[in-house]
């Protein structure tokens, strides 16, 4: 018996991903100045406000505010019309030096366990497959590519009414042994948009400029359900719609 497997991806303008990119940018800034930096940076965004907080051990001292503002603007939040703007948002920096008590516990040669070099340990696993050129399963590969295409079309001006926040889901039908993809059960593409565009124009534009260039026609069956902005309206998005927090940590 065949089964359906679904994967989801969010665009660079989705608030969760915005927080991720800000924390990443802070980490990269410290590692550029000091490759041995230990960084725990958490980002929270809501409306036109950005907070970064965390503890850092580093000889570097990058100016974080312009880095954070540029990251937000580069994503596409560069106008007050979106309610979130990298140039005008309220920025609060609550990043401080790491506690010396914690620092000695994660510095090799210090603390009670002289060989311990990290304060947190974890096990991660993953695998590659041959379903796609990216070596990832088809549903997540297509989901990633759809939101990437949405961002590209927005930045290139192909659909002038697109805004940064977007999410996609792709459901693939697999044979009972999991070795053969029989087609797609459903495609969902929700994208933020300007107020003055009709739902018909949104559906046509997304289908022609985003979905068709990415999804091979042979995967779209007569039974495939395609949902484009199924709620009917997605004007309010990003951190104006929801608040998000994301942590980026690095230890050496």
Regions found by a protein language model. Give the residues of each.
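Short glycine-rich, basic-tinged beta-strand/loop micro-motifs
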Residues: 1-5, 45-55, 185-187
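N-terminal, positively charged regions that mediate nucleic acid binding
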Residues: 1-38
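Glycine-rich, mobile lid/loop segments that gate access to catalytic sites or pores
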Residues: 6, 77, 85-239
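Conserved small/polar residues in nucleotide/adenosyl-binding loops
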Residues: 245-252
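Short edge beta-strands and adjacent turn/loop segments
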Residues: 37-44, 168-172
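Short glycine/threonine-rich loop-to-helix capping motif typified by GTGT followed
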Residues: 55-62, 232-244
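Glycine-rich, N-terminal phosphate-binding loop and its surrounding beta-alpha-beta segment
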Residues: 39-42, 48-106
